[in-house]
Amino acid sequence: MSRPLSDQEKRKQISVRGLAGVENVTELKKNFNRHLHFTLVKDRNVATPRDYYFALAHTVRDHLVGRWIRTQQHYYEKDPKRIYYLSLEFYMGRTLQNTMVNLALENACDEATYQLGLDMEELEEIEEDAGLGNGGLGRLAACFLDSMATLGLAAYGYGIRYEFGIFNQKISGGWQMEEADDWLRYGNPWEKARPEFTLPVHFYGHVEHTSQGAKWVDTQVVLAMPYDTPVPGYRNNVVNTMRLWSAKAPNDFNLKDFNVGGYIQAVLDRNLAENISRVLYPNDNFFEGKELRLKQEYFVVAATLQDIIRRFKSSKFGCRDPVRTNFDAFPDKVAIQLNDTHPSLAIPELMRILVDLERMDWDKAWDVTVRTCAYTNHTVLPEALERWPVHLLETLLPRHLQIIYEINQRFLNRVAAAFPGDVDRLRRMSLVEEGAVKRINMAHLCIAGSHAVNGVARIHSEILKKTIFKDFYELEPHKFQNKTNGITPRRWLVLCNPGLAEVIAERIGEDFISDLDQLRKLLSFVDDEAFIRDVAKVKQENKLKFAAYLEREYKVHINPNSLFDIQVKRIHEYKRQLLNCLHVITLYNRIKREPNKFFVPRTVMIGGKAAPGYHMAKMIIRLVTAIGDVVNHDPAVGDRLRVIFLENYRVSLAEKVIPAADLSEQISTAGTEASGTGNMKFMLNGALTIGTMDGANVEMAEEAGEENFFIFGMRVEDVDKLDQRGYNAQEYYDRIPELRQVIEQLSSGFFSPKQPDLFKDIVNMLMHHDRFKVFADYEDYIKCQEKVSALYKNPREWTRMVIRNIATSGKFSSDRTIAQYAREIWGVEPSRQRLPAPDEAI
C-alpha cells in the first residue's frame, strides 16, 4: 500500500500544468459549450449573440491564464528588473481577436465557431472597445504593453479602471453630441478583480512635524481596488499584466462624522469617494486644472507605488511578508516610466515614502528616486502643459507640496551654482511659477526628478532641447534622449489587414511579424508584376469591404474606385482639419467651374472626436458635415467627390478604415505634432502620405525617400521666420483667388444657407488669430494634392510607391521603440526567447 501523501505533496496536485488546454477544434468546441452552460448559465434556446461572444471570450481566456500564471511564477523565480509604465490612459480597443492572434488560436477558433453555426466576425463586433484613452498617448501605451510582452520584459501597465471611457460621439443635425460610454454594462470577461490587493490612498489632512520627522495626519481615505488584465506577447508564452485601479469607499466612510440618523446619507455619500475612477477626462492636448483630475492623478500614483514597493520587498520569496528592507537596490530592480506629466506626482510620492515612512535621509532618497524615474514628454503646446495651482495642492496633498518646495529649493541651488548670477534663469527653471495664481510646473518637476527625459520623434526631441526645455538641457544634457514612437504590427497589420499580411508572408515568410525590419526584403519585389497586382488587389478588397460597412452602418454610398483620402485623429486646430476642408471646397469649386473636365474621383473622409468644451473643434466638425451636405447632394458633382464625416472614430473603427485608405493626411503645422502614430499605421497598411515635415513624418520620409512621400508646406525654420516677421492671413487672402473664393463662401453662408453666419467664428479665426497658419500652407497643399491625383491615374506607379512605403516602415514598430527604452533608459535587455507552454516542464 502506498504511503499517504504529505500536505506538501497533496498541494503539488494544485498545478497549472495539469490544466493545460489542448488547442484543437474539438476541445475549443467542448470548452465553448461548457462556458455557455456553466459560466453563462444559458442554453442554445435562450442564448443571445452576446452570450456566444462571452462564451468564446472565456474559451480563449482559458488559454491565456495558464501562461499568465506561469509568466508571473517565472518573474518570481528570476527576480528580473521590473518595468512600471504609469499612464492615465490605456486605449486598448478590443481584446478577443488580438488574443487569438498572439496565441495562434485564430484558425482553430474560426473553424470551431463555423462548425457551431456561428460567424466569428459577428461575434468580434459585439465586443465593446476598452476606450480608456483620448487618442495617441493612450493608444501608444497599449502598443507599448504589447511590445513589452513580445520582448519578454517583466513589465506592468498601471492606470485607472474608468467606469466610463472616452464618450461615444453621435452626429445630430451636423453637430457632435456626446454619450456616456458605459463599456462595463455587460461585464468584462478579460479582467480579474483582485480585492485582496486593495490599498488605501490618502487625501486632504495636514502635516505635523514631530521629532521623528513629518507626519501626514487626519486624511480622508479612499480604497484602490486593482483589476488585472492579461497582456499576451506574440507567440512566446509571455503574459504580462495591466493593473487598473478602481476607487472604493472604505466601510466606515463618513460614518464617524455623522450624528445618529445620518447612516443612510453616509452610505449614499460613498459615491463621492468612488467618483475618482468614474470617468476619463476627454481633453486631448489641453490642461484643465480640475480637482477631480488631480485626485485621479494622485490616486493612480499612490496605489501603484505601494504595489511596486510591496513587490520589491517580497519579490522572489513567494510570500507577502516584507523581506527586502534596504532600498539601495531599488533602482536596479525597478524602473518607473511616466507617460507624460499626468503621473508626475510619483516623484514627490516616492520621496514621501522613502523619507517619511522608510526614514531615509533626503539625499539618498533623492538619488534613488531620480535613478528610478524617467519621463516621456508628448507635447510642446503651451495650453497642454500641466501647471497645478498651489492652493489646490495645499488642500489636497499638503505633504507633497512641502516636498515639491524642498525639491525646488535644492534644484535651484544647483542651478545657481552652475550659472552664478543668472537670476532670470532661476525664474525660468523654477518648479514654482509666480503670478496671479501660484502654480507648480509639472514638466519641470519631472525633468528634475528623472534620470532620462525623452521626446517621441527626432524633430520633437530637438525642439525640446532648443526651446521649452533649453535651460534644463544646458544644465543636464545627459538626461535628454529621443525615442521615436512606434505601433504594434500585431494589431496594426496582422489583425486589421490579414490580406496584406498574407501577401507579404507569401514572399518573405512570417518573421516580419516580430521583426518588422524584415519588410525591407520587399524592396526586391517593387518591379514584380505579380506582387504589384497582389498588393493592389488586397487594397481594392479592403476598400470594397469598408464601403460595404459604411453602407450597412450609416447608409452612406461611396464610389469604391475613387481615391480614399483619409484624415482620422482628434479634432484640434493644430492638426489642421480646416486645411483639408479648404482643399475639399477648392476641388468642389473646380468641378463646378469645369463640369466636363476629367477629375480623379475622391472620397474624403474625416473622423475624430472634439473635446466637449472645445468650441472651435466642434465648429470644425459642423463645417465638415455642412460641406458634405452641399457636395454630396450636388448632381453636377456626381461620384467625383464625396465628403464623409466618420462618426465615433475609435480603435475598432481605425482597424477598418486604415487598411482601406489610399491617402493619409498628416498636415499639422510644422513643430506642433510631437510624433503622431496614425501616420505609421497608414504607411504600414499601404496608404501614401501627404504631410508636412512634422513629428515622425520627417523620419518616415527619410526611410521611404522623399520622392515616395507627398511633402508640402513650411518647415519648422520657416514657421519660426514667419513668426518673427508676423503672420498676416490677409496677404494670402488678397494674393490667392481660389482661397479668397473659399473664404467668401464660408462667410456668405454658401454652406449654411439657413444660418449664413454659422461659420463666422472659423472665418474670423483664420483671418485674424490663426496660431497654426492654415493660409500659409494652402497654396503648396493644393499643388501637392494635384500631384497625388496625377499619380493615382497611374495605378502601377502608385502601387510601386505603396510597396516602397510598406517596405521601409519597419523602423516604426513599437518593438524597436521599446527595445531602445529597455537598453537606453531602463537598463534591461529585451529577449525573444519563448517561455515553456503551460503543459511543458519548466
From Swiss-Prot:
Its cofactor is pyridoxal 5'-phosphate. Changing residue 292 to P: In GSD5; rare mutation. The keyword Phosphoprotein applies. GO terms for cellular component: cytoplasm; cytosol; extracellular exosome. Its EC number is 2.4.1.1. The modification Phosphotyrosine is found at residues 204, 227, 473. CDD domains: GT35_Glycogen_Phosphorylase. Keywords: Acetylation, Allosteric enzyme, Carbohydrate metabolism, Disease variant, Glycogen metabolism, Glycogen storage disease, Glycosyltransferase, Nucleotide-binding, Phosphoprotein, Pyridoxal phosphate, Transferase. It is linked to Glycogen storage disease 5: A metabolic disorder resulting in myopathy characterized by exercise intolerance, cramps, muscle weakness and recurrent myoglobinuria. This is Glycogen phosphorylase, muscle form. It comes from Homo sapiens. The lineage of its organism: Eukaryota, Metazoa, Chordata, Craniata, Vertebrata.
